[in-house]
Amino acid sequence: MAKHYFQVDVPTWSAAQPERQGRHIFTGSADDGRQAVRLARRVCEATLAARAAGEPLPRRSPDGWGARGVRPGWELDWTAATVVPWRHNSLL
C-alpha cells in the first residue's frame, strides 16, 4: 500500500489550568489513519520522555513525524484524535 501524508489533530489542555484548551497537530506519512495516530503518539511520547530525562529532543523522522512543539504540562486526549489527509497550503 502506498504511503499517504496525514494530519492528526489531538485535543489538549493545560494540567495546571484545564480551562486552557487547544489542539496539537501532527503530520507525517503512514499507510492509513490508524497507523498515523500510532506514529504521532509514538513520536509524542519519545519527545516527552527525552524532555523529562534532560536529553536532546528527537528530530523529525524521515517519514515526517515529529513532536518538538509538544508542551510539557499539557495533556493530550488520544482517544479523541481525528485524522484527515493532509492538504498542503502553499499560502502559509
Model-derived regions, located:
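Short aromatic-glycine-(Arg/Gly/Cys) micro-motifs in beta-strand/loop hairpins
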Residues: 1-23
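Residue-level marker of intrinsically disordered, low-complexity segments enriched
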Residues: 6-8, 23, 35, 41, ...
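Acidic-enriched, low-complexity/disordered segments with a strong bias for Aspartate over Glutamate
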Residues: 9, 31-32, 63, 77
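A structural signal for the main folded, soluble domain(s) of proteins
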Residues: 10, 18, 27, 76-84
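A short, exposed loop/beta-hairpin motif centered on an aromatic-Gly-Thr core
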Residues: 20-33
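A short, charged, amphipathic alpha-helix used as a generic interaction element across diverse proteins
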Residues: 31-54
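Short, mixed-charge low-complexity intrinsically disordered segments
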Residues: 46-92
